[in-house]
Amino acid sequence: MQDPNADTEWNDILRKKGILPSKEDLKDLEKEAEEEEQRILQQSIVKTYEDMTLEELEDNEDEFNEEDERAIEMYRQQRLAEWKATQLKNKFGEVLEISGKDYVQEVTKAGEGLWVILHLYKQGIPLCALINQHLSALARKFPDVKFIKAISTTCIPSYPDRNLPTVFVYLEGDIKAQFIGPLVFGGMNLTLDELEWKLSESGAIKTSLEENPKKPVEDVLLSAVRCSVPAKRDSDSEDD
């Protein structure tokens, strides 16, 4: 097959007839074809990046040119942000059961900037069961906080049952708040929102509740008194 780029008399005739493109047009076509090839190649490289893990990107870093590295760095930051978000979301999310031998590792050495909420409980105490139920819901809602529970006497031998339930709030191994005994929690009327608010006051969780869902005792008593006293009739007022 004859080369259409060759400077032959026959090719010149074909160019004049418009059958072959001019040399200038041919160069433009070749340039466009080369640019298209580079574009397709670049898309293929980017797609390869998307299939790589962060570790694979690190391993193949020496094979990338300067333009590749800029594209990869942007993609790397995106993947890293997604990974961090996933790690945070899935960090805890449930209440972990521990015993006394796990205390130092799970509480004292829990980690920098990490809040830990520990519930000391015993089986057969209804309020302890209720708080465990509420803590499970809060653990799912606040997965960046470490919620743990332990049978009281496995952590503190001879710990009196009258002090149960007990909740300790820690930050970096230091106690920031403690709630001891049923009266602190308001008994079996304790709601999930009330417990969330109580824990948020210690700083352990960032609640979206705008106000304390539990009415002050004074307000409750005052409302009860008002409801129990009948309103005076107009005739009674006139007699006075």
From Swiss-Prot:
GO MF terms, alphabetically ordered = protein folding chaperone; vascular endothelial growth factor receptor 2 binding
Q: What is its main location?
A: cytoplasm
Where are the residues of the annotated region Thioredoxin fold?
A: 92-240
Q: How is it modified after translation?
A: N-terminal methionine acetylation destabilizes the protein.
Phosducin domain location is 33-181
Positions modified as Phosphoserine?
Answer: 44, 235, 237
Pfam families named among the record's database cross-references: Phosducin (PF02114)
Q: Name one GO biological process term.
A: angiogenesis
Q: Which UniProt keywords apply?
A: Acetylation, Angiogenesis, Apoptosis, Chaperone, Cytoplasm, Endoplasmic reticulum, Phosphoprotein
Compartment(s): Cytoplasm; Cytoplasm, Perinuclear region; Endoplasmic reticulum
* Cellular component GO terms, alphabetical: cytoplasm; endoplasmic reticulum; perinuclear region of cytoplasm
Location of N-acetylmethionine modifications: 1
In terms of InterPro entries, this protein maps to:
Phosducin-like_chap/apop_reg, Phosducin_thioredoxin-like_dom, Thioredoxin-like_sf
**What PANTHER family does the record point to?**
PHOSDUCIN-LIKE PROTEIN 3, VIRAL IAP-ASSOCIATED FACTOR HOMOLOG
The family this protein is said to belong to: Belongs to the phosducin family.
- Subunit structure of this entry? Interacts (via thioredoxin fold region) with KDR/VEGFR2 (via juxtamembrane domain). Forms ternary complexes with the chaperonin CCT complex and actin substrate, leading to inhibition of actin folding. Interacts with XIAP (via BIR 3 and RING domain). Interacts with HSP90AA1 and HSP90AB1.
**Task performed by this protein:** Acts as a chaperone for the angiogenic VEGF receptor KDR/VEGFR2, increasing its abundance by inhibiting its ubiquitination and degradation. Inhibits the folding activity of the chaperonin-containing T-complex (CCT) which leads to inhibition of cytoskeletal actin folding. Acts as a chaperone during heat shock alongside HSP90 and HSP40/70 chaperone complexes. Modulates the activation of caspases during apoptosis.
State the name under which the record lists this protein: Phosducin-like protein 3
Organism source for this protein? Bos taurus (Bovine)
State the gene name recorded for this protein. PDCL3
